[in-house]
Curated annotation (Swiss-Prot):
Signal sequence annotation: none
Any GO BP: ribosome disassembly
Subcellular location: Cytoplasm
Organism: Lactococcus lactis subsp. lactis (strain IL1403)
Function: Catalyzes the GTP-dependent ribosomal translocation step during translation elongation. During this step, the ribosome changes from the pre-translocational (PRE) to the post-translocational (POST) state as the newly formed A-site-bound peptidyl-tRNA and P-site-bound deacylated tRNA move to the P and E sites, respectively. Catalyzes the coordinated movement of the two tRNA molecules, the mRNA and conformational changes in the ribosome.
Entry GO MF terms: GTP binding; GTPase activity; translation elongation factor activity
Name of this chain's protein: Elongation factor G
SUPFAM superfamilies per record: EF-G C-terminal domain-like (SSF54980), P-loop containing nucleoside triphosphate hydrolases (SSF52540), Ribosomal protein S5 domain 2-like (SSF54211), Translation proteins (SSF50447)
Binding site for GTP: 17-24, 81-85, 135-138
Family named by the database record: Belongs to the TRAFAC class translation factor GTPase superfamily. Classic translation factor GTPase family. EF-G/EF-2 subfamily.
Positions of the tr-type G domain: 8-297
Chief location bin: cytoplasm
Residues spanning the membrane: none
UniProt keywords, alphabetically: Cytoplasm, Elongation factor, GTP-binding, Nucleotide-binding, Protein biosynthesis
Length: 709
């Protein structure tokens, strides 16, 4: 079957925002206007098309990235609706990795919120061009220009309106397009009855006068903001700059082309206005997706490495190139089993054919290829460059794996996975649940790389870790619903880490003689602290074979196994460099096991002088409270070992930004509610790991049954 839409007419976009900014409702309206659905489902009624999991419909939030395909004015738009809740940040990250552009949805009353900052930072890391949609213009307190100021103040983003709203709150009646200088005035609730007029024309004046608006004021405002738009875009386009300084009129097509170029280069962020719930501005937002966000042809060729030669390689977006794709999500479907979502960067792929998973070095057969619309599916025979689809039948593929033509191997840049910050103990309620729980947890961990399952070596308990209480709550809930496993769940615990704060060298010597073959392993290892977030690095600096080459991997393995159960309180150790530089062996008695034990002994010896420290997750906390409660909040932060970072006024509220240890935030919602009579709110996002104070460290060590020395 031939390609239905050309690459130039394809858009792969994400819709991302802070929780409750209205992303899913915006996506619903897109599906309605593009003819994908014929009845609009409301998120707050639990009827949304994109929120298809039972938990999503009950909680009114988006947990997984639902993918769907829509068509708009002769273009194919693949849309991924991503969660805004911080606990599901991996869903945003893996979506951004495979998208070409994104729509950032803001709540026009609040502007940029904490999770907006997080997703914006992630999008910047991946170089994703964005347009901004100021949603909820009909809401009490909606302020388009305040939202614009927060983009600059909180994100440092070069955002400029390409539209301005007519009215706000209950009086939000339309939008002026600053590029075309036309207005859209909505005369019915479905947003389908639209009056389009030229700004400043008699018709425009009459329409606004009939609705009690001052047309002259809006004409002036539109001219002023158009001038600012041209001035801003002139920085990125010499032709426009020349025309602007010469006082010449700038044609619509030229202005559009200049905005598109600056947006694709991630120099400029066009800002739009609307109310998805009231069906206003969504069609204009869709037009902006086509006009200003890139097609797969507009972005640089995807970079990778040839696994055979270790040389850099790339794949331009073309059907003629060898097949290359990235698996960005694994999901278990109750009807078809394991689904692997993938983005095709180059080449084509037919159902029933074979691909090579270059990340794992395994051949995989593509059973069926499905095009997804939330949780319904359409079977297709072929996928082309630029497509997003799901494959059935991939047994070994996990998130971040590269799938390529067997004759043209390439490993594409993978997806970075954040470390879990919270953990809890789970145990099956009955013996019958025991085996089922193991299978269920394994399947859930396959789907979600930020979800870890471990067994405590000392107690034999199963410990699950994730990005937050809601994250683990949803996964335990899924275990019950999808796998019919009943489990008892312990109280949430902080996922502490351990590290070394000083450099040292230590010897690990292991010798055992008990008749027959003995054991002999002897190593000298230099330990130094690594950069934060850099993880564990092992270097083999052995010269002259004093430790035979075949035993070196055992030394590394011994260190890794020891680090899994740290030296102070049994927490995983991170950010340490280890250099094996000397040792000795015995011709007969040396073995892998002996060197593994020797490495473990060296690390435990090093702990005596390497100043081991316990690290705790620090959360970036944003607390919004009425002015009269500000004093209480400052007290809350200080009492929780927190540090106030900044404060700002927003209307009659105060916004406090602070860093607070996660350990001190359990139960804070109740404290805040009672001290503000329910008027205060807070959001927290994981920021970094930091050393715990000595007194707290001693408490943690004592609690874990270790000695503080």
């Amino acid at each position: 079957m031939a390609r239905e839409f050309s690459l130039a007419n394809t858009r792969n976009i994400g819709i991302m925002a802070h929780v409750d900014a209205g992303k899913t409702t915006t996506t619903e309206r897109v599906l309605y206007y593009t003819g994908k659905i014929h009845k609009i489902g409301e998120t707050h009624e639990g009827a949304s098309q994109m929120d298809w999991m039972e938990q999503e419909q009950e909680r009114g939030i988006t947990i997984t990235s639902a993918a769907t395909t829509a068509e708009w004015k002769g273009n194919r738009v693949n849309i991924i609706d991503t969660p805004g809740h911080v606990d599901f940040t991996i869903e945003v990250q893996r979506s951004l990795r495979v998208l070409d552009g994104a729509v950032t949805v803001l709540d026009a009353q609040s502007g940029v919120e904490p999770q907006t900052e997080t997703v914006w930072r992630q999008a910047t890391e991946y170089g994703v061009p964005r347009i901004v949609f100021a949603n909820k213009m009909d809401k009490i307190g909606a302020d388009f220009y305040y939202s614009l100021s927060t983009l600059g103040d909180r994100l440092g983003a070069n955002a400029h309106p390409i539209q301005i709203p007519i009215g706000a709150e209950d009086d939000f009646i339309g939008i002026i397009d600053l590029v075309t200088m036309k207005s859209e005035i909505y005369t019915n609730d479905l947003g389908t009855d639209i009056k389009e007029t030229v700004v400043g024309s008699d018709e425009f004046n009459a329409e606004l006068a009939a609705l009690d608006f001052n047309a002259e004021e809006y004409t002036e405002l539109a001219n002023e903001w158009r001038e600012k738009l041209i001035e801003a875009i002139a920085d990125f386009d010499e032709d426009i700059m020349e025309k602007y300084f010469a006082g010449e009129e700038i044609p619509e097509a030229e202005l559009k082309a200049a905005i598109r170029k600056a947006t694709i280069n991630v120099d400029f962020y066009p800002m739009l206005a609307g109310s998805a719930f009231k069906n206003k501005g969504v069609q204009m937002m869709l037009d902006a997706v086509i006009d200003y966000l890139p097609s797969p042809l507009d972005i640089p060729a995807i970079q990778g490495v040839n696994p055979d030669t270790d040389e850099e390689d790339e794949r331009p977006a073309s059907d003629e190139e060898p097949f290359a794709a990235l698996a960005f999500k694994i999901m278990t479907d109750p009807f078809v089993g394991r689904l692997s979502f993938f983005r095709v960067y180059s080449g084509t792929l037919d159902a029933g054919s074979y691909v090579l998973n270059t990340s794992k070095g395994k051949r995989e057969r593509i059973g069926r290829i499905l095009q997804m619309h939330a949780n319904t599916r359409k079977e297709i025979q072929t996928v082309y460059a630029g497509d997003i689809a799901a494959a059935v039948g991939l047994k070994n593929t996990t998130t971040g794996d590269s799938l390529t033509d067997e004759k043209a191997k390439i490993i594409l840049e993978s997806i970075e996975v954040p470390e879990p910050v919270i953990q809890l103990m789970v145990e099956p309620k009955t013996k019958a649940d025991q085996d089922k729980m193991g299978v269920a947890l394994q399947k859930l961990a396959e789907e979600d790389p930020t979800f870890r399952v471990e067994t405590n070596p000392e107690t034999g308990e199963t410990v699950i870790s994730g990005m937050g209480e809601l994250h683990l709550d949803v996964l335990v809930d899924r275990m019950k619903r999808e796998f019919k496993v009943e489990a008892n769940v312990g109280a949430p615990q902080v996922a502490y880490r351990e590290t070394f704060r000083a450099g040292t060298s230590a010897r690990g010597f292991f010798k055992r003689q008990s008749g027959g073959k003995g054991q002999y392993g002897d190593v000298w290892i230099e330990f130094t602290p690594n950069e934060e977030g850099a993880g564990f690095e092992f270097e083999n600096a052995i010269v002259g074979g004093v430790v035979p080459r075949e035993f070196v991997p055992a030394v590394e393995k011994g260190l890794v196994e020891t680090m899994a159960n740290g030296v102070l309180a049994g927490y995983p150790m991170v950010d340490i460099k280890a250099k094996l530089y000397d040792g000795s062996y015995h011709d007969v008695d040396s073995s892998e096991t002996a060197f593994k034990v020797a490495a473990s002994l060296a690390m435990k010896e090093a702990a005596k002088t390497a100043k081991p420290a316990i690290l705790e997750p620090m959360m970036k906390v944003t607390i919004t409270v009425p002015e009269e409660n500000l004093g209480d909040i400052m007290g809350h932060v200080t009492a929780r070992r927190g540090q106030v970072n900044s404060m700002e006024a927003h209307g009659k509220s105060q916004i406090v930004n602070a860093f607070v240890p996660l350990a001190e935030m359990f139960g804070y919602a109740t404290t805040l509610r009672s001290s503000t009579q329910g008027r205060g709110t807070f959001m927290m996002v994981f920021d970094h790991y930091s050393d715990v104070p000595k007194s707290v460290q001693e408490e943690i060590i004592a609690k874990n049954g270790r000695n503080a020395d």
